[in-house]
Amino acid sequence: MRKIRYKETQPFHLIVIICAISIALMTFFIIKQLINNDTIPYTLIACCLLFIVILILFYKLEIIITSRYAIASFGIGLLYKKIAINELDITTARGVKIPWYWGIGIRFTPEGTLYNTHTGGNLHIKTKNKMNEFFVSTSNASSIITALREAQNASNT
């Protein structure tokens, strides 16, 4: 059993609002089309299903630090990044303020792949081989760094 040392859940408000409005509008037009016509609006149904899938995949960002892994996952957990605690180089941990135009979601930036639900504060930690990084949006960077240090110290003893 893995011991959870830190857990943060960030709701992705923007994607939830956009998807909810889109799904509601498309459902309204689907029902209207079915009442007024005998044809089935397959395109609207497909678009509605697409927004439902997007909503399920991206409705939240969860950051979990266990005794063995640092994990950042979106939605139900199909899109995630998982790095072993021992691979992270805590000395490279730094807060990064990203520009608003980098956007939100999974972003490929000059700093690395960012898992982001809002603009503002982010935490960037490189791995010891400098080939990968743990780059997430958070306002609790110091708590994550503390949890990572504790997990690394516990695994080294």
Predicted regions and their residues:
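Short acidic (Asp/Glu) patches
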Residues: 48-50, 108
